[in-house]
Amino acid sequence: MVNVQHYLTLVAMAGAVVTNADQTYFQGDGTPYDLDKVGHGNCAFMSSWSKAVTNYVAVNQAQWDDLTHCGQCIEATCIDAKCKNRNTAVTLQVVDRCPQCQYGDLDMSPSALIKIVGSNPGRIKIGWKYVDCPEPGTIKFCLKTGSNKWWVAIQPTNTRIGVKSLSINGKAGKMLDGAYYYYIESEDVVPFNKIKVAVTSINGDVVSGTYSMKEGECVDTKQQF
Protein backbone atom coordinates (compact mmCIF):
# COMPACT_ATOMS: atom_id res chain seq x y z
CA MET A 1 0.00 0.00 0.00
CA VAL A 2 1.20 3.53 -0.76
CA ASN A 3 2.49 5.39 2.31
CA VAL A 4 -0.09 7.95 3.47
CA GLN A 5 2.41 10.82 3.50
CA HIS A 6 3.57 9.85 0.00
CA TYR A 7 -0.08 9.83 -1.06
CA LEU A 8 -0.65 13.32 0.35
CA THR A 9 2.39 14.64 -1.51
CA LEU A 10 1.17 13.11 -4.76
CA VAL A 11 -2.28 14.61 -4.39
CA ALA A 12 -0.91 18.04 -3.59
CA MET A 13 1.34 17.93 -6.66
CA ALA A 14 -1.29 16.74 -9.10
CA GLY A 15 -4.42 18.74 -8.39
CA ALA A 16 -7.59 16.75 -9.07
CA VAL A 17 -6.34 13.24 -9.85
CA VAL A 18 -3.14 11.27 -9.32
CA THR A 19 -2.44 7.84 -10.76
CA ASN A 20 0.30 5.78 -9.12
CA ALA A 21 0.89 2.02 -8.90
CA ASP A 22 -2.48 1.29 -10.53
CA GLN A 23 -4.27 3.47 -7.95
CA THR A 24 -6.29 6.56 -8.81
CA TYR A 25 -6.57 9.25 -6.16
CA PHE A 26 -9.08 12.06 -6.12
CA GLN A 27 -9.36 15.25 -4.12
CA GLY A 28 -12.23 17.52 -3.24
CA ASP A 29 -14.28 18.80 -0.34
CA GLY A 30 -15.35 16.53 2.48
CA THR A 31 -18.56 17.50 4.25
CA PRO A 32 -20.55 15.82 7.05
CA TYR A 33 -24.12 14.59 6.66
CA ASP A 34 -26.46 12.43 8.69
CA LEU A 35 -28.09 9.26 7.35
CA ASP A 36 -30.48 7.62 9.79
CA LYS A 37 -30.26 4.17 8.16
CA VAL A 38 -27.84 2.73 5.61
CA GLY A 39 -30.80 1.40 3.64
CA HIS A 40 -32.19 4.91 3.23
CA GLY A 41 -29.33 5.94 0.93
CA ASN A 42 -29.80 5.95 -2.85
CA CYS A 43 -28.25 2.47 -3.05
CA ALA A 44 -31.17 1.19 -0.91
CA PHE A 45 -29.10 -1.58 0.66
CA MET A 46 -30.94 -4.47 2.27
CA SER A 47 -27.64 -5.61 3.79
CA SER A 48 -24.31 -3.79 4.08
CA TRP A 49 -20.76 -3.83 5.44
CA SER A 50 -20.89 -4.09 9.24
CA LYS A 51 -19.10 -0.75 9.73
CA ALA A 52 -21.26 1.18 7.26
CA VAL A 53 -23.59 2.30 10.07
CA THR A 54 -20.91 4.76 11.19
CA ASN A 55 -18.60 4.74 8.15
CA TYR A 56 -20.85 5.64 5.22
CA VAL A 57 -20.23 7.98 2.30
CA ALA A 58 -22.17 9.62 -0.53
CA VAL A 59 -20.38 10.07 -3.87
CA ASN A 60 -20.71 13.25 -5.91
CA GLN A 61 -23.05 13.27 -8.92
CA ALA A 62 -20.25 13.39 -11.53
CA GLN A 63 -18.65 10.19 -10.17
CA TRP A 64 -21.88 8.42 -9.22
CA ASP A 65 -21.95 6.44 -12.48
CA ASP A 66 -25.59 5.40 -12.18
CA LEU A 67 -25.27 3.34 -8.97
CA THR A 68 -22.30 1.25 -10.16
CA HIS A 69 -20.10 2.24 -7.18
CA CYS A 70 -22.68 1.18 -4.58
CA GLY A 71 -21.08 -1.07 -2.00
CA GLN A 72 -17.50 -0.19 -2.87
CA CYS A 73 -15.22 1.09 -0.12
CA ILE A 74 -13.31 4.36 -0.11
CA GLU A 75 -10.24 5.30 1.92
CA ALA A 76 -10.25 9.01 2.72
CA THR A 77 -7.56 11.21 4.24
CA CYS A 78 -7.51 14.90 5.13
CA ILE A 79 -5.14 16.93 2.93
CA ASP A 80 -6.05 20.34 4.33
CA ALA A 81 -3.41 22.31 6.26
CA LYS A 82 -6.01 22.91 8.97
CA CYS A 83 -6.29 19.20 9.76
CA LYS A 84 -4.87 17.86 13.00
CA ASN A 85 -4.83 14.22 11.84
CA ARG A 86 -3.29 14.36 8.36
CA ASN A 87 -1.76 10.87 8.74
CA THR A 88 -5.09 9.25 9.67
CA ALA A 89 -7.16 7.41 7.06
CA VAL A 90 -10.72 6.15 7.36
CA THR A 91 -12.50 3.49 5.29
CA LEU A 92 -16.09 4.18 4.22
CA GLN A 93 -18.72 2.32 2.20
CA VAL A 94 -20.57 3.98 -0.69
CA VAL A 95 -24.27 3.88 0.19
CA ASP A 96 -25.60 7.13 -1.22
CA ARG A 97 -25.33 9.93 -3.79
CA CYS A 98 -24.64 13.63 -3.19
CA PRO A 99 -26.43 15.45 -6.05
CA GLN A 100 -25.12 18.91 -5.15
CA CYS A 101 -21.48 17.82 -4.64
CA GLN A 102 -18.87 18.67 -7.27
CA TYR A 103 -16.39 16.25 -8.88
CA GLY A 104 -14.08 14.87 -6.18
CA ASP A 105 -16.36 15.85 -3.29
CA LEU A 106 -17.69 13.39 -0.72
CA ASP A 107 -20.48 13.66 1.85
CA MET A 108 -19.30 11.63 4.84
CA SER A 109 -20.59 10.40 8.16
CA PRO A 110 -19.79 13.05 10.81
CA SER A 111 -17.86 10.62 13.02
CA ALA A 112 -15.62 9.54 10.13
CA LEU A 113 -14.89 13.13 9.14
CA ILE A 114 -14.01 14.04 12.72
CA LYS A 115 -11.64 11.05 12.87
CA ILE A 116 -9.52 12.21 9.93
CA VAL A 117 -9.73 15.94 10.71
CA GLY A 118 -9.47 15.96 14.50
CA SER A 119 -12.50 18.24 14.86
CA ASN A 120 -15.82 18.99 13.15
CA PRO A 121 -14.80 21.38 10.36
CA GLY A 122 -18.01 21.55 8.35
CA ARG A 123 -16.02 21.49 5.10
CA ILE A 124 -12.42 20.40 4.53
CA LYS A 125 -10.12 19.33 1.70
CA ILE A 126 -9.76 15.55 1.41
CA GLY A 127 -8.00 13.00 -0.78
CA TRP A 128 -9.48 9.57 -1.45
CA LYS A 129 -9.27 6.33 -3.42
CA TYR A 130 -11.27 3.13 -3.88
CA VAL A 131 -10.01 0.19 -1.78
CA ASP A 132 -11.07 -3.36 -0.95
CA CYS A 133 -13.63 -3.45 1.84
CA PRO A 134 -11.90 -4.89 4.93
CA GLU A 135 -13.53 -7.92 6.56
CA PRO A 136 -16.67 -7.83 4.39
CA GLY A 137 -17.85 -11.29 5.38
CA THR A 138 -19.56 -13.25 2.62
CA ILE A 139 -21.61 -12.00 -0.32
CA LYS A 140 -25.39 -11.93 0.04
CA PHE A 141 -28.04 -11.87 -2.68
CA CYS A 142 -31.19 -9.95 -1.75
CA LEU A 143 -34.53 -10.30 -3.57
CA LYS A 144 -36.37 -7.01 -3.94
CA THR A 145 -39.87 -6.66 -2.57
CA GLY A 146 -42.23 -6.56 -5.54
CA SER A 147 -40.35 -9.20 -7.52
CA ASN A 148 -42.60 -11.76 -9.19
CA LYS A 149 -42.35 -14.79 -11.46
CA TRP A 150 -41.80 -12.63 -14.56
CA TRP A 151 -39.87 -9.66 -13.10
CA VAL A 152 -37.00 -10.34 -10.72
CA ALA A 153 -34.64 -7.82 -9.09
CA ILE A 154 -31.64 -8.93 -7.04
CA GLN A 155 -29.11 -6.90 -5.07
CA PRO A 156 -25.55 -8.20 -4.46
CA THR A 157 -24.23 -6.99 -1.10
CA ASN A 158 -21.17 -7.33 1.15
CA THR A 159 -18.80 -7.59 -1.82
CA ARG A 160 -15.09 -7.03 -1.17
CA ILE A 161 -14.69 -5.07 -4.41
CA GLY A 162 -16.97 -3.50 -7.00
CA VAL A 163 -19.46 -5.43 -9.11
CA LYS A 164 -19.28 -5.46 -12.90
CA SER A 165 -22.39 -7.49 -13.71
CA LEU A 166 -25.02 -9.88 -12.38
CA SER A 167 -27.07 -12.51 -14.19
CA ILE A 168 -30.29 -14.23 -13.15
CA ASN A 169 -31.03 -17.67 -14.58
CA GLY A 170 -28.37 -17.03 -17.21
CA LYS A 171 -29.89 -13.73 -18.35
CA ALA A 172 -27.86 -10.52 -17.96
CA GLY A 173 -29.38 -8.20 -15.39
CA LYS A 174 -29.99 -4.51 -16.03
CA MET A 175 -29.47 -1.86 -13.37
CA LEU A 176 -32.74 -0.64 -11.89
CA ASP A 177 -33.29 3.12 -12.01
CA GLY A 178 -32.98 4.71 -8.58
CA ALA A 179 -31.80 1.75 -6.48
CA TYR A 180 -28.96 -0.77 -6.55
CA TYR A 181 -30.65 -3.86 -8.01
CA TYR A 182 -30.06 -5.88 -11.15
CA TYR A 183 -33.30 -7.01 -12.74
CA ILE A 184 -34.57 -9.21 -15.56
CA GLU A 185 -37.90 -9.51 -17.32
CA SER A 186 -38.72 -13.05 -18.34
CA GLU A 187 -41.36 -14.66 -20.53
CA ASP A 188 -40.74 -17.88 -18.65
CA VAL A 189 -41.75 -18.32 -15.03
CA VAL A 190 -38.87 -17.76 -12.59
CA PRO A 191 -39.39 -20.02 -9.55
CA PHE A 192 -38.17 -18.31 -6.38
CA ASN A 193 -37.16 -21.62 -4.83
CA LYS A 194 -34.57 -22.24 -7.53
CA ILE A 195 -32.95 -19.05 -8.84
CA LYS A 196 -29.51 -19.24 -10.41
CA VAL A 197 -27.51 -16.08 -9.69
CA ALA A 198 -23.99 -15.21 -10.85
CA VAL A 199 -22.19 -11.99 -9.92
CA THR A 200 -18.94 -10.86 -11.54
CA SER A 201 -16.50 -8.44 -9.91
CA ILE A 202 -14.66 -5.59 -11.61
CA ASN A 203 -11.61 -7.90 -11.56
CA GLY A 204 -13.46 -10.75 -13.28
CA ASP A 205 -14.00 -12.96 -10.21
CA VAL A 206 -17.32 -14.84 -10.22
CA VAL A 207 -19.53 -16.00 -7.37
CA SER A 208 -22.50 -18.12 -8.43
CA GLY A 209 -25.02 -20.64 -7.21
CA THR A 210 -28.66 -21.69 -7.16
CA TYR A 211 -30.69 -20.33 -4.26
CA SER A 212 -34.13 -20.46 -2.72
CA MET A 213 -35.14 -16.83 -2.20
CA LYS A 214 -37.96 -14.84 -0.64
CA GLU A 215 -39.14 -11.30 -1.36
CA GLY A 216 -37.53 -8.73 0.92
CA GLU A 217 -34.94 -11.19 2.24
CA CYS A 218 -31.27 -12.00 1.60
CA VAL A 219 -29.49 -15.32 1.17
CA ASP A 220 -25.87 -15.93 2.15
CA THR A 221 -23.71 -17.28 -0.68
CA LYS A 222 -20.99 -18.28 1.81
CA GLN A 223 -18.54 -17.06 -0.84
CA GLN A 224 -16.51 -13.92 -1.50
CA PHE A 225 -14.57 -12.49 -4.45
Regions found by a protein language model. Give the residues of each.
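Mature exported/compartmentalized surface modules and terminal targeting/interaction regions
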Residues: V2-G104, S111-F225
